[in-house]
């Protein structure tokens, strides 16, 4: 089959045309998602939903013009965030993104909303989760009066394409809102009631790949989460395979037939009744960018003019640092939790084991890469301890791995197996295309 996949990301919108039998990408297109709205509130991260839909439709239309043989359309995009829709299926407000910080504001007797939820319901949530955002809006009179329900931006795009008046949210996206029972595939309405929310606002949910309707006569399927889509695009449904993604953040994912969660590890709905076990490092590849900025700022102070980007030099430093790391009895160690963790948002990174001999640019550069990898490897060890998943393959995605061979080698050393870079650069869009062909009659 020839399928189209659309990925509505936070900063870009991508589309691909994929031959799902051969795996060949016939066409790809990526445009900037420049839809952020400046509200004047530094904690608020919202985007213009109408502008996103317009840009995404232009990308899709271009694919359809170039490839009229497309027989299905799959959707994915940024999870957690919500768009309110009215009874006619129209957006009534912006997209409140996963980056939104209202859930961390200390506005409830000196506590954040996530703390209130944890105390009242025993649930671990994060600011940016859809129901955390909705609860804050409800308590502050910010929910539009016309709002009937809410959904993700890719669900809303599916509604616009097909003319649906009510969203149908796949469990992979519904779970990202919070207050969701992953085992049973439904919202935890009893806990929703504890925080005085009306469950009538919750969207309809499905755990199957279903057809939403059609666009230009072509079936459009329910959107899936970008984490699941990226795994499907890069790995497929292979077991014993770990997907490592290193972009702005870092993420580790593996398929399991067994439900398992622990601190730092989340079980997310996948497809065909399976689970995607995953964990994330919040800083991820940004840790390396922070180090690059550090070196560049030094050069700016030492020289006149604007210094060039330092990544090529840092690769040389990292290579030398690796040799020193393996031969040094007490290597410098970097904890790259510069932005905290999901469980400990106030935690910060550190550099330890500094000596006269190892405090060098080479050791620091390699130490940051090693710290980035160790954050994800430590998360894998938690999965392995709970599920005994033996790793036979490593698949890597994201520019942090594609552009950094030393980081690839570090992961290979840690896991004791080779790492293969994903065949696709637009894994999520390819996964969305694949998902559109998984309809079961």
Features from the language model and the residues they span:
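A conserved helix-loop-beta module that forms one wall/lid of the active-site cleft
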Residues: 189-210
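A short local loop/turn or secondary-structure capping micro-motif enriched for an aromatic residue
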Residues: 34-37, 101-103, 285-286
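Short, conserved phosphate/pyrophosphate- and ester-handling motifs at nucleotide-, phospho-/glycolipid
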Residues: 48, 100, 226
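N-terminal glycine/serine-rich phosphate-binding loop of ATP-dependent small-molecule kinases
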Residues: 1-94, 119, 146, 218-222, ...
């Amino acid at each position: 089959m020839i399928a189209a996949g659309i990925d509505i990301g936070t900063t870009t919108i991508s589309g691909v045309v994929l031959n799902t039998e051969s795996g060949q990408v016939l066409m790809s297109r990526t445009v900037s998602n420049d839809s952020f709205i400046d509200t004047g509130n530094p904690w608020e991260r919202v985007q213009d939903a109408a502008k996103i839909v317009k840009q995404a439709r232009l990308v899709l239309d271009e694919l359809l013009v170039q490839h009229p043989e497309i027989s299905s359309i799959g959707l994915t995009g940024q999870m957690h965030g919500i768009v309110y829709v009215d009874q006619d299926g129209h957006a009534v407000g912006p997209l409140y993104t996963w980056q939104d910080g209202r859930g961390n504001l200390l506005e409830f007797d000196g506590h954040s909303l996530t703390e209130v939820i944890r105390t009242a319901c025993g649930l671990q949530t994060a600011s940016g989760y859809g129901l955390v955002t909705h609860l804050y809006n409800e308590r502050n009179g910010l929910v539009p009066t016309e709002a009937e329900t809410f959904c993700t931006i890719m669900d809303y795009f599916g509604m616009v394409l097909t003319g649906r008046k009510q969203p149908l949210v796949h469990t992979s996206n519904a779970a990202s809102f919070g207050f969701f029972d992953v085992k049973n595939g439904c919202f935890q309405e009893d806990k929703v009631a504890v925080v005085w929310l009306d469950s009538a606002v919750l969207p309809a949910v499905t755990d199957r790949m279903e057809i939403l309707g059609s666009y230009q006569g072509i079936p459009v399927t329910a959107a899936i989460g970008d984490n699941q889509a990226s795994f499907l695009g890069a790995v497929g449904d292979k077991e014993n395979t770990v997907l490592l993604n290193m972009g702005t953040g870092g993420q580790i994912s593996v398929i399991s037939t067994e439900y398992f969660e622990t601190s730092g590890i989340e079980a997310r709905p996948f497809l065909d009744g399976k689970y995607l076990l995953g964990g994330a490092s919040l800083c991820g590849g940004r840790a390396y960018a922070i180090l690059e900025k550090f070196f560049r700022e030094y050069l700016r102070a030492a020289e006149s003019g604007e210094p060039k980007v330092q990544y090529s030099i840092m690769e040389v430093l990292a290579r030398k640092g690796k040799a020193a790391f393996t031969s040094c009895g007490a290597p410098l160690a970097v904890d790259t939790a510069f932005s905290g963790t999901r469980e400990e948002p106030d935690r910060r990174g550190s550099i330890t084991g500094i000596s006269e001999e190892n405090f060098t640019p080479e050791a620091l550069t390699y130490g940051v890469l090693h710290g980035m990898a160790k954050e994800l490897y430590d998360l894998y060890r938690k999965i392995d301890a709970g599920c005994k998943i033996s790793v036979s393959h490593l698949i890597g995605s994201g520019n942090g791995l594609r552009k950094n061979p030393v980081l690839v080698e570090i992961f290979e050393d840690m896991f004791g197996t080779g790492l293969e870079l994903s065949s696709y650069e637009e894994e999520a869009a390819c996964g969305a295309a694949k998902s559109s062909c998984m309809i079961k009659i």
